[in-house]
Structure formats: structure tokens, C-alpha cells
Curated annotation (Swiss-Prot):
The keyword Protein biosynthesis applies. It comes from Prochlorococcus marinus (strain SARG / CCMP1375 / SS120). GO terms for cellular component: cytoplasm. The gene is prfA. This is Peptide chain release factor 1. Gene3D superfamilies: 3.30.160.20, 3.30.70.1660, 6.10.140.1950.
Length: 365
């Protein structure tokens, strides 16, 4: 993004910010809580941008003054040296600020602020793949708890020898999707399974889908499209187990998507969870269809977000986790303990780099 384009967009943001300030002072807005919240949220989003722009304007003014001082100091070597030092300092400040502002103005994914549902499925590898799916679930649970998110199992199909054939986890918190969206894809593990008697290394996989939570207004469900049946739960529930039909089996007839919920103690709670999962799955389906049509959007992403894309290999023998999109290795034990900040941070930085590169190409056209 060239400087003139950057400043034009910052001027627009400043004008919008000033207009929002006026609206907040309007008694009609103050008496409408919903409108007040919307305007206040947008103002809060723009405020750091506007403050940085004011700082950039102040630096520009100081730079002009330092340049004029340099011009007038040709006969005073000491003053000339001081003016040159000041120019270098201001150039560095401006460079850092322009980079920060450019990143702030990059196109945002409107889903970034949402909570998510993680769907983890065992892939190739039989029983070991199910155990691996469980290991991934624990990794995300540890990371979520570390950063203060609320992590809860929504639906699970347990495997006979441990782990899960399929598991859906709700992860609630601030901007969860902005960080976990990079986890979508195939996660491959290379290790000696606990069930392997001859010490041979096996390769197994699990797929992860990251589904932003869908608002009921956003994804409307027609009652005629739903087929709901109940069953006796086989999970935790004390005296409820196998005596009361608390499990809910939900089928969305137009798409064939089926959701089975047993995690909650009551049928009503399981029904609500099943509908929540279904909305997220339908929203993910819409997003995948849109991405398939919008190829250019994928060029500015770290990976496609497709659950069939192999994104990472976890090699136990070498204690190494390789992210194939970045071509970078991370310590295996650290990653599995839920220490994902470095890995996710690298994905975010790469996505920003690609977006800036794309903006630069557009500016040249």
C-alpha cells in the first residue's frame, strides 16, 4: 500500500471516527441501547487507528522542521550532525508506524471475533488415528485454558481402545477464530503406537475443521427440514444413563448432515447443543462454497482452510512438529502441551505478509 493510499484511508477512518463521536452525543442514540452499543464498539475499534494517525501527522511535522534545521545548519557542523540524527530517528519512527497502520488497515475476516467449534475426526490409521484425535483434542484444550477460553465437549464418539472417532469441542472466548482458523486441515503423526509390539513407526492422521459459531438469525433452520429422534444416553449421567432418552439424533434432510449429542444430562440441553452444532456446520458449508468460487481470496491465506489439506506433521522420533505451510519446525513436546503461541503467531505473520504482498501487487496494477 503506497503512502498516498494509506493516508487517504486514514483520513476516511478519522472522518468516520469523528462522526461516531457526534452520534454518541446524540440523545436519540443514547436512548437506544442496541444502537449505542453498535456505535460505541465501532468507535472503540477505530480509536487506536486514529490515535496512530495523529502520531504519524506529528512525526511528519517534526520531520519537516528537522529538515529545515538541517538546511540552515550547513555552517554549524555540530548542529548539522544533530539535525541528521533527528531525521534518522524520525524516519525509523515513521517506518514502524506506517507498518503498524498498514497492518491495521488490512482486510479483516468478519468471523475473526467469533467463538468456534472444533470438529476432530480420526483419519487413516485405525485405532491409532482415534488415539491421535484424542491427543489433538487435549492439545487444544490445554491451549484454550492457558489463554482463558472456555472449552467444552459438545459431541463425542469414543473409540474402543481410547481416543475418539469423532469429537466436537466448543471454544468460547474473544477472537478465537482469528487464532484457531489456522488449525483446519490434516494433522499427521509419526510414532510407535502403544499397541505396536515390534517397535515400528506408524503414520496416522486426524482432520480438524474449525467452524465459527453461527448466530440463529444468520443460519435459519426450517422445522420441516429437521428430523429429530431420541435415544438412551450411554455416557455420564448417573441414574439417567440407559433409563431416560436424553441423547438427541438430529438430521438435516436437505444436506444429509447428522448430529448426535449425548454430552448433556437432559434431552432439551442435548437438542440445543445439536442445533448449535448444525448451524455451525451449515455456516462452514456456505463458507467452503464461497471459497471455492473466490479463488483470489485463497491466495491471501495461509492454507485454504480446507479439512483435506495436509498442514502439519508431528514426528515423535525427532521430537519435531513441522508446519508445511510455513516450512518451519517447532518442538513437539511444547506444541502437544498446548504451547501454540509461537506456531499460531507465525501463521498470523505469514498471512499478514501475503495480504500486504497482494495489496502491493494491486497498487502496481
Amino acid at each position: 500500500m503506497d503512502t498516498s493510499t494509506l493516508k487517504a484511508r486514514l483520513e476516511t477512518a478519522s472522518a468516520t471516527f469523528n462522526n461516531l463521536e457526534l452520534q454518541l452525543a446524540d440523545p436519540d442514540v443514547a436512548s437506544d441501547p442496541k444502537k449505542l452499543e453498535t456505535i460505541a464498539r465501532e468507535r472503540a475499534r477505530l480509536e487506536p487507528l486514529v490515535l496512530d494517525y495523529k502520531e504519524l501527522q506529528a512525526i511528519d511535522l517534526e520531520y519537516k522542521e528537522a529538515k529545515e534545521l538541517l538546511r540552515q545548519s550547513k555552517s554549524d557542523k555540530e548542529m548539522e550532525a544533530l539535525a541528521q540524527e533527528e531525521l534518522i530517528r524520525l524516519e525509523e519512527l515513521e517506518k514502524d508506524l506506517v507498518n503498524r497502520l498498514t497492518l491495521a488497515l488490512l482486510p479483516k475476516d468478519p468471523r475473526d471475533e467469533r467463538s468456534v467449534m472444533l470438529e476432530i475426526r480420526a483419519g487413516a490409521g485405525g485405532d491409532e488415528a482415534c488415539i491421535w484425535a484424542g491427543d489433538l483434542a487435549r492439545m487444544y484444550e490445554r491451549y484454550g485454558l492457558k489463554v482463558g477460553w472456555v472449552v467444552k465437549a459438545m459431541s463425542a464418539t469414543e473409540a474402543d481402545l481410547g481416543g475418539f472417532r469423532e469429537l466436537i469441542i466448543s471454544v468460547k472466548g474473544k477472537a478465537v477464530f482469528s487464532q484457531l482458523k489456522f488449525e483446519a486441515g490434516v494433522h499427521r503423526v509419526q510414532r510407535v503406537p502403544a499397541t505396536e509390539s515390534q517397535g515400528r513407526v506408524h503414520t496416522s492422521t486426524a482432520t480438524v475443521a474449525v467452524m465459527p459459531e453461527a448466530d440463529p438469525v444468520e443460519v435459519k433452520l426450517e422445522p420441516t427440514d429437521l428430523e429429530i429422534s431420541t435415544a438412551r444416553s450411554g455416557g455420564a449421567g448417573g441414574q439417567n444413563v440407559n433409563k431416560v432418552e436424553t441423547a438427541v439424533d438430529l438430521l438435516h434432510k436437505p444436506t444429509g448432515i447428522r448430529v448426535f449429542c449425548t454430552q448433556e444430562r437432559s434431552q432439551l440441553q442435548n437438542r440445543e447443543r445439536a442445533l448449535e452444532i448444525l448451524r455451525a456446520k451449515l455456516l462452514e458449508r456456505e463458507i467452503e462454497e464461497a471459497n471455492a468460487k473466490e479463488r483470489s481470496a485463497r491466495l491471501a491465506q495461509v492454507g485454504t482452510g480446507d479439512r483435506s489439506e495436509k498442514i502439519r506433521t508431528y514426528n515423535y522420533k525427532d521430537n519435531r512438529t513441522t508446519d508445511h505451510r510455513l516450512g518451519v519446525n517447532f518442538p513437539l513436546e511444547t506444541v502437544l502441551e498446548g504451547e501454540l503461541d509461537d506456531l499460531i503467531g507465525a501463521c498470523i505473520a505469514e498471512e499478514q505478509r501475503l495480504k500486504m504482498e497482494k495489496l502491493g501487487n494491486q497498487s502496481e496494477e
